Amino acid sequence: MIDFRPFYQQIATTNLSDWLETLPLQLKEWETQTHGDYAKWSKIVDFLPDLHADEIDLKSAVKSDRTFPLSEGEKQRIIHHLKQLMPWRKGPYHLFGIHVDCEWRSDFKWDRVLPHLAPLQGRTILDVGCGSGYHMWRMVGEGAKMVVGIDPTELFLCQFEAVRKLLNNDRRANLIPLGIEQMQPLAAFDTVFSMGVLYHRKSPLDHLSQLKNQLVKGGELVLETLVVDGDVNTVLIPADRYAKMKNVYFIPSVAALINWLEKVGFTNVRCVDVATTTLEEQRKTDWLENESLIDFLDSNDHSKTIEGYQAPKRAVILANK
């Protein structure tokens, strides 16, 4: 099982120390309710070899390598273990010559977001809904002091720990398997990311308030979410599914989203990027057995989802507390 005690020790002397009032008990409770496959997944992490990378690049990729390459047999054993943690959704990773080609080219999103951010050097960062942690490693690559990701999905935790093991057990990033609604208001993070989460929330304004409660005064929110075309009064509430997803509740226009952020007290709210999701950014690979974007769009008109809604378009909004 994954040991969270090193993280407790890490934060004990930082401005995250108040979290120790609640977090250890929450994770003890979490351990009693884990997914039936969690024990198997965590053992796969244990089965991965302890390799030392001579070269790690988190600035332009998430990559580890060594001077003397692995043998083909060693590579195949690692691939075998990693493929038992499928589906791999967010990546890509390049680990000792193994290309983990995930469903999402999350480097595309990072390249859209990064130029607009306040410098991450020396910052304490929270990544809400972090998935398996790809963007967390890129934040470390930008010089972040500490990156904490939260995501309740046990598979993502085990994928993250597998990647960490192949990055020389780097402890500058940590994934905690909780949702933001379970976090006490810490007001301790310099930057808070919420990317690809808001539209899954039944109460989006509550989510925005929860993000605000984790920021230091003046800290930066990075919000990336689905949007639709329209004015300040435009919000899509899908009747049933959106792009085959059942858990999509509110998709606002950019203007409506800015209004929501201002309503909960954020300042300096601005949209810095809007991009339609392409078939190059989200697609099927050998590391994903499920359907992908091509299956979610109208086969005759890729400007629409299979349900007839506007195809996925994503905005990046920055704001300050």
From Swiss-Prot:
InterPro entries: CmoB (IPR010017), Mo5U34_MeTrfas-like (IPR027555), SAM-dependent_MTases_sf (IPR029063). Catalyzes carboxymethyl transfer from carboxy-S-adenosyl-L-methionine (Cx-SAM) to 5-hydroxyuridine (ho5U) to form 5-carboxymethoxyuridine (cmo5U) at position 34 in tRNAs. It comes from Haemophilus influenzae (strain 86-028NP). Belongs to the class I-like SAM-binding methyltransferase superfamily. CmoB family. The gene is cmoB. This is tRNA U34 carboxymethyltransferase. It catalyses: carboxy-S-adenosyl-L-methionine + 5-hydroxyuridine(34) in tRNA = 5-carboxymethoxyuridine(34) in tRNA + S-adenosyl-L-homocysteine + H(+). Keywords: Transferase, tRNA processing. Its EC number is 2.5.1.-. It holds the Pfam family Methyltransf_9. Carboxy-S-adenosyl-L-methionine binds at K90, W104, K109, G129, D151, P152, T153, I180, E181, M195, Y199, R314.
